[in-house]
Amino acid sequence: MGLCHTQDSITKRVKLMQSLENHFLIAMPSMQDPFFKRAVTYICEHNEEGAMGLVINQPIDVTVGELLDKIDIDNDKSQHAAQVTVFAGGPVKTDRGFVLHSPKPGYSASQKLSSDIMITTSKDVLATLTTAKAPEQFIITLGYSGWEQGQLEQELLDNSWLIIKADPKIIFDTPVEKRWEMAVSMLGFDIGQLSPEAGHA
């Protein structure tokens, strides 16, 4: 009975909580999961069934050019885009690529997440990344982060994450090593003020 009551309570909170799509989840310093230590996760989808997001500050030892080679997409190694680092977007389906990019007309395979951010898994879009047809700004992740129904809400109640509206400048313009600090600073306080008991925004 206790477990069912807990699940029902979490489900009710899911219905009451606004969608966190186009928000950042900022890992608290107390985060125990090594994958999400100091992680900034961009939430792409959040509804009553669960949530899906991409970590934007966990680089891996793979470049865009190397990734395109692995999936047999011709690319121009002389282009700066080919040298851009790929990120680990999460522990789920780590062989699957996701592209967050700035809006570009004609990208019918991309889904608009906000006025500044689109997402795609299309190989057609990947094939443009080292060409003149590429979006102005983009990042690629391998894998994604997923939460089942009520799981993210419970983690928020457990103070595992801070929440803030996403800023595309942090995704596309901020150096990787500064993204967590910059996201925290958007909340209006210093990193040193964070503690396991700080709660979520």
Question: Model regions: which residues?
Answer:
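Short, Lys/Arg-enriched N-terminal segments with co-localized hydrophobic residues
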Residues: 2-16
